[in-house]
């Protein structure tokens, strides 16, 4: 079983170069459902480098921060490293609402003890203000998150409904 798992992880990691943002989004969406999904997402994003596009760097940061949840040691280091990846991506593209969504979702789900919650209102505003200028595919992804999020009010959720 371990051999099959290792082989699976190898192929996932190897195929990252050919992966689309849509495939990464799907993996990110299910990563929070289980430890195994988180580990798969973390492995998938390991090939992302500082030379990749900012959105991939943001997802890499998210994978590191999510992986910290299951780490026995180095939790602080993983959280710090993940945050650096996300913030660096946002510094490169501050108006990218998908990067804003990644940061918002992390801040929404991290325990209150982790000091990474101060940008939620700012990110919500950028997401809501720019929602209709995005592609239909990205709008659907954003809408799915917003409808399930506790950070958005019922009025804000209505605002982006079809």
Over which residues does each language-model region extend?
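Short coil/turn linking the two alpha-helices of tandem helical-hairpin repeats
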Residues: 31-32, 66-75, 109-114
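Bacterial Sec-dependent N-terminal signal peptides
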Residues: 1-22
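N-terminal leader/linker segments that initiate helical-solenoid repeat arrays
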Residues: 18-42, 48, 57-59
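Helix-turn-helix repeat elements of alpha-solenoid scaffolds
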Residues: 30-44, 75-83, 116-117
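Terminal, low-structured helical/coil segments at or just beyond the last alpha-helical repeat
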Residues: 127-162
């Amino acid at each position: 079983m371990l051999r099959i798992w290792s082989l699976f992880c190898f192929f996932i990691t190897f195929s990252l170069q050919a992966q689309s943002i849509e495939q990464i989004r799907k993996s990110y969406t299910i990563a929070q459902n289980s430890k195994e999904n988180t580990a798969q997402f973390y492995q998938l994003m390991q090939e992302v480098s500082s030379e990749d596009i900012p959105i991939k760097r943001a997802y890499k940061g998210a994978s590191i921060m999510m992986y910290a949840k299951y780490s026995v040691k180095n939790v602080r280091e993983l959280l710090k490293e993940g945050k650096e990846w996300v913030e660096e991506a946002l510094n490169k593209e501050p108006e990218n609402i998908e990067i804003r969504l990644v940061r918002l979702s992390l801040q929404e789900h991290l325990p209150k003890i982790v000091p990474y919650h101060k940008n939620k209102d700012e990110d919500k505003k950028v997401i809501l203000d720019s929602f209709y200028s995005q592609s239909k595919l990205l709008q659907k992804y954003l809408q799915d998150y917003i409808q399930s999020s506790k950070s958005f009010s019922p009025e804000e959720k209505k605002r982006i409904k079809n």
